[in-house]
Amino acid sequence: MAEVLKVLDGPQWRTYARVHERRAGRFADPFVRRREQGQAHPVEDFLFTYYTLKPGQFKRWHPGAGVILLDTAERVSWKFYRAATEDELVLAGLSPDDAHTHAECGDAVLVDVPQFVDKRGTALTFTREILGNTADKKAFFGCFGMHEWAMAYKSVQNNIRHDYLDLRLGAEGTDRVVESHRIRCSHFDAFRFFMPQAAPMNELQPTRETQRTMEQPACLHANMDIYKWAYKLIPLIDSALVMDCFELAWDARELDMRAAPYDLLDWGYEPIKVETPEGKAKYVQHQRELSERSVALRRRLLTTINTFL
């Protein structure tokens, strides 16, 4: 069980909660408004439609394990929370009298680490394995985002249409780019969306079973998935770390789509023309920056997970 590190009184933790709600709302609120109006955004919606954390859950603040919140009896009923004991409150720095008062009224709560580990131990172990394996891999910066192009390959034959996006080079131009480039995609959840004619071109043939051993730290989608691994461990993981992972995923998604074969100028996105040497260089520059951020986030997540396993 994690050591109780600190206590936050009502005004303190509510300030943190408001800050988090504003930070998360900057991304979630426009998505919710678009959804209510029947609108879609080809870049920004992805993190709320592909991933499973709902906007309301996304905006809900959690302190993470080892923090006791005062004046919040309602959280006792939240999943993986429990009331703090009198001894825990004293250990965390409250006077015996104050500890007794809060324990009696049940308004001091914290994350129930033993219950989480008991119920979600498999998720913890898997997350540690996939993050650790990815961290140990050498980054490969030679894919140039070709996975998105492979998903649009032979679009005419496959009758693939994007209602509000055109292919920047047209169907034939897109096919030529795919056919003239090396494709080396290690991420199964990208590879599974390749067009049938493009799948055999991939030098790697990732599967769900090999996912935990094939991810590598330059992959945009592996780096986006750090957000997924983080939110699956809520409330054990604090919301600030989850948001840092989300913002990495947000930036990776933008790079992914700027380098994709679609024309997004009308949406305000300048293309990164990865079919050219200049575009490849720009893509790798941004990819390296994201990879460096991912290294730090994996380390933070692994440090937290290792506390409980």
Regions found by a protein language model. Give the residues of each.
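Active-site acidic/histidine clusters and adjacent loop/turn architecture
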Residues: 1-130, 267-309
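An amphipathic alpha-helical core segment
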Residues: 185-282
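Residue-level signal for alpha-helical context at structural boundaries
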Residues: 166, 244, 263, 305-308
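Short secondary-structure junctions and interdomain/linker hinges
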Residues: 134-141, 200, 233-237, 252-259, ...
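A contiguous catalytic/ligand-binding core that recognizes phosphate-bearing ligands
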Residues: 105-210
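Alpha-helix initiation/capping motif
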Residues: 54, 160, 166-170, 238, ...
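Short, Lys/Arg-enriched charge-dense amphipathic segments
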Residues: 160-171, 260-270, 281-290
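Generic alpha-helix signal with a bias toward terminal, lower-confidence helices
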Residues: 63, 92-93, 146, 153-158, ...
